[in-house]
Amino acid sequence: MLGSMAEPRRTRLTPEERRAQLLALGVAGLADRPLEALSLEDVSAEAGVSRGLMFYYFGSKQGFHREVVRVAGDSMLRATEPLTELPPLERLHDSLTRIVQFVRDHRGTFFSLVRGAASGDKEVREIVEGARGVHSARLARLFHDLGVEDSVLFTIALRSWVAFTEETLVAGALDTDMTIDEIVSFLERSLLAVLTVVDPAAERTLAQ
């Protein structure tokens, strides 16, 4: 079943509200099916609207899928927004904890986002890459706050670690009974190890 996030059937909604409702149902549908199995028929039936209305709002099944991925990615970014009032390393720990918790709570959504990176749809890939870029930028700000200097290798290391983290979350958070603390500790240590290779002078800063 898709989620129960829809308004009651035949409720008159504004176009903006209806579009948001259909996307919410699409994101909820990722809980028990992959993105490619998310059909316009199922979503329109759940919302109590015609299939033609789906085409009116999204143009095609692919257009709907793109917007579902965009909304799902935005929801993850909002849920894991760094708390800038925390000291940098505490901020890292808190953000990673909330990321792992999000993945555990929204397995299908996260898996669809990761799989979207390999999608044949260029726009879906761009949406996923955009979310990765936000995660990398957040990490860069955090380490700049610690005094770690920017460089080409620093940027490459952060983006590579984000991809590494995705695989760790799929394999560790979704496919094992590892605790959240165990996964977070592993990710913290791996990130700090990578950065000290890129910038050996950062080791003393990170150890403080």
Q: Predicted segment positions?
A:
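N-terminal intrinsically disordered/low-complexity leader segments
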Residues: 1-17, 201-208
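Short glycine/proline-centered loop/turn elements that form peptide/ligand docking sites
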Residues: 6-10, 28, 37-39, 47, ...
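Short hydrophobic clusters on alpha-helical segments that form packing/core surfaces
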Residues: 18, 22-30, 53, 72, ...
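Helix-turn-helix
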Residues: 21, 29-63, 67
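Hydrophobic alpha-helical connector segments
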Residues: 67, 81-107, 145, 157-161, ...
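Amphipathic alpha-helical packing segments from all-alpha helical-bundle domains
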Residues: 77, 122-147, 152-163, 181-196
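Short secondary-structure transition hinges
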Residues: 104-140, 144, 170, 174-177
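Short, hydrophobic secondary-structure boundary micro-motifs
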Residues: 111-114, 181, 203-204
